[in-house]
Amino acid sequence: MTIETQEEPPEIKVYLPRVGITNLKSVAKIEWKGRIYTFIPTFEVAIDLPEEKKGIHMSRLVESITETMSEAVEEEVKKVHTSLEDLALCIIRRIEKKHSHKRAEVWIKSTLILERQTPASGKTSYEPYDVEVGVIKNSDGSIKKVLKVKVIGNTACPHAMANNQGKTHIQRAIAELEIETHFNEDIALEDMIEVVESSFSSPTYTLLKTPDENAVVRRMYENPKFVEDVAREIVYKARNRFKGKIHVKVISHESIHKHDVIAEVWA
């Protein structure tokens, strides 16, 4: 007979709002716009723990992940997940069958690879974007989601350009866009990436032939921006396209300084 020490009372009775597992890696397949995308996501799953119980049953959280994606579970195979948040919600629904709780969270981090065309030669380039999706079930049963994207671009300094006969310094910039919204709100990670990427002086590319490199440099010089300009443009576009709480953070890795610069905004 198994002794369930998790069900015993703790020495110190304190309610814990988040207890679970983190840094669990697995594999997931998502169908989007008629294509199957394979991800190697990292999961963080947490539930709340009442003050009268010593611990949670960690293995049940792991089972909820593996069973959701396992071909051994027939009802899951019949439904191909259409998004990372759909996958996260299915994990929460499975936790509901395995472990008592009032509140639950599933966070999924991964890399989304999108096909792009280089600006001059038109060659195909595959670009990586860090994404994160969180689905949260509150104690009242309501469901919300958090979508995050991180995009790499670049900026050309307008101040140096204005004071140096058109010459300026260029740096890599990294922008993050986060949206917290109702679960049923339809927001695609690809659309969030497009909002961010179009707000830099220029996008960056994995593949650049000489004509492409020249095109990127010209675009940067034709479109100089402070990090502040990038943050403002992202939040402006995001407010016009998406519903929810918006957070934008842009960091510019300065090429002429030993420090970086940052701009951040909430809306």
Curated annotation (Swiss-Prot):
NCBIfam families: PRK13675.1-1. Its cofactor is Fe(2+). This is GTP cyclohydrolase MptA. One of its GO terms (biological process) is tetrahydromethanopterin biosynthetic process. Binds 1 Fe(2+) ion per subunit. InterPro entries: GTP_cyclohydrolase_FolE2/MptA, GTP_cyclohydrolase_MptA. Belongs to the GTP cyclohydrolase IV family. Keywords: Hydrolase, Iron, Metal-binding. Its EC number is 3.5.4.39. The record marks 157 as: May be catalytically important. PANTHER family: GTP CYCLOHYDROLASE MPTA.
